[in-house]
């Protein structure tokens, strides 16, 4: 028989640096999950990613306090800021542009994000990422 799900916790944790301090500790502790076990497993799974990149993670906690987790790809905004070489997006994206991204960079980001996007094909995925770039105040070339 399948285990009963007790809770689903969604967090955004820096790759390779999960530790028991907030936000991880309190979120898992209130559901009785072994926090260190999660931290070790998460850090091992995100070793290949860029250290410090924010990684969304969905943790499924079962009634017997065991858990499974699924890591997603880093947010598009993080990848776009890295590609454009900026610290943050524009406060006024329609009037004040803060950087530029090329079509090739958008395609690279779309390839990275492909597992998490619901786009029908790669062109639609690139358009989705381009829309995110424009909303952040980035010029899109190409």
From Swiss-Prot:
Q: Which InterPro entries match?
A: Ribosomal_uL11 (IPR000911), Ribosomal_uL11_bac-typ (IPR006519), Ribosomal_uL11_C (IPR020783), Ribosomal_uL11_C_sf (IPR036769), Ribosomal_uL11_N (IPR020784), Ribosomal_uL11_N_sf (IPR036796)
Q: Does the keyword rRNA-binding apply?
A: yes
Keyword Ribonucleoprotein in annotation = yes
Provide a GO CC annotation, any one.
cytosolic large ribosomal subunit
Give one GO molecular function term.
large ribosomal subunit rRNA binding
Q: Name one GO biological process term.
A: translation
Give one Pfam hit by family name: Ribosomal_L11
Record note on modification? One or more lysine residues are methylated.
Which Gene3D superfamilies does the protein's record reference?
A: Ribosomal protein L11, C-terminal domain, Ribosomal protein L11/L12, N-terminal domain
Arranged from A to Z, the UniProt key words for this protein are:
Methylation, Ribonucleoprotein, Ribosomal protein, RNA-binding, rRNA-binding
- What protein family does this chain belong to? Belongs to the universal ribosomal protein uL11 family.
The role this protein plays is:
Forms part of the ribosomal stalk which helps the ribosome interact with GTP-bound translation factors.
Subunit composition and interactions: Part of the ribosomal stalk of the 50S ribosomal subunit. Interacts with L10 and the large rRNA to form the base of the stalk. L10 forms an elongated spine to which L12 dimers bind in a sequential fashion forming a multimeric L10(L12)X complex.
Q: What's the protein name?
A: Large ribosomal subunit protein uL11
Q: Which organism is it from?
A: Idiomarina loihiensis (strain ATCC BAA-735 / DSM 15497 / L2-TR)
């Amino acid at each position: 028989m399948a285990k009963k799900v007790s809770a689903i916790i969604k967090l955004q944790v820096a790759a390779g640096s999960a530790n028991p301090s907030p936000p991880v500790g309190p979120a898992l502790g209130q559901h009785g999950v072994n926090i260190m076990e999660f931290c070790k497993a998460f850090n091992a799974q995100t070793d290949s990613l860029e250290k410090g990149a924010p990684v969304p993670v969905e943790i499924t906690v079962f009634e017997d306090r065991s858990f499974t987790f699924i890591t997603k790809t880093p947010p598009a905004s993080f990848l776009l800021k890295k590609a454009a070489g900026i610290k943050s997006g524009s406060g006024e994206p329609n009037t004040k542009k803060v950087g530029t991204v090329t079509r090739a960079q958008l395609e690279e980001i779309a390839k990275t994000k492909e597992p998490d996007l619901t786009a029908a094909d790669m062109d639609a995925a690139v358009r989705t990422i381009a829309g995110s770039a424009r909303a952040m105040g980035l010029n899109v070339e190409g």
